[in-house]
Amino acid sequence: MSGFRFVHAADLHLDTPFEGLRDTAPAVGRALRDASLEALDALVDLCIEVDAAFLVIAGDVYDGPERGLRAQLRFRAGLERLSHFGVRVLVVHGNHDPTEEGWSAIREWPEGVHVFGSERVEAVEIDGVATVYGISYPRSDVRENLALAFPRKAGRSEGTGLRVGVLHCNAGGHAGHAPYAACNLDDLTGAAIDYWALGHVHAREVLCEDPWVVYPGNLQGRSPHAGERGEKGAMVVDVEDGRVAAVTFRALDRVRFLVSELDVSSASDLGEVESRLRAQRVSRGAARCAAISAGPGRCATCWSPCARSRGGDRRPRTAFPSSGGRPS
């Protein structure tokens, strides 16, 4: 196999509670309650669509150590589907779902699934074309620099094919994110890794291209806060002759948060404000939108894209806001 693809996702936060506005109306609660799980379904669809050799998930599969039963069953169902299509899955746990906290209803994983332990960096070979390295968090508050535990360039002879490092960490001191497993870029580029599949930071960012150091962002936005706005999804990585040839973002979110400028200074009543908001929705091509907050000439909104369901049809998703929720 001279060329192949893999998918890099992180921070699924399955069954995230969207604390703040879930109880404002039944429709709001339903839309938000299902958003993270439907984004997971879309991730599974993407892996099958692009014929991915494997999927890496860089931490925070669940939103908290309690790991709700609904989220666990949905996650396992997605992994079973990927296993059926021959897609390997490699998972690390992060600060929201550490291995030694919470509980698990899953006693046996589907074939082809590997969950990295927390005692040391493990290596998993993928059909002779790649070696994936990873380590999970044993507890939520990990302060060690885990990047230094990965193979260094001096040991370059180790591993086969493309070397992928999966790590949940704060690289470069991102503001607004706890300094868990904090490291700097030199710690990452000094390792014998060709592609760093990072998680923890919810804003999508490519820190380096040689080697690749990538945050895909979270799978589903959770609030109108800066790092949660805009398109959310995963990265599709194309590999040719043992080297990364392309890294492409694919949006998978079911609910999207944006902040838009809407001039309502001349509006005579609330009905006119709503009319202008609807007009803005149409201009953006969104299925539906809702106002979150407003100030002089400024209106924070969230939008639902016209999303592809698991059955392949095009159908809109209702979009409603949430508060900031839990920190990442």
Give residue spans per PLM region.
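Residue-level signal for alpha-helix termini/capping positions
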Residues: 48-49, 80-84, 282
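His/Asp/Glu-rich metal-coordinating catalytic cores
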Residues: 54, 65-239, 243-244
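Glycine-rich phosphate-binding loop signature in dinucleotide/nucleotide-binding domains
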Residues: 49-51, 156-159, 283-284
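A conditional alpha-helix N-cap/helix-loop micro-motif detector
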Residues: 33-37, 71-72, 143, 177-178, ...
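Short loop/turn motifs at secondary-structure junctions
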Residues: 3, 51, 192, 243, ...
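Accessory, non-catalytic peripheral segments of nucleic-acid enzymes
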Residues: 247-328
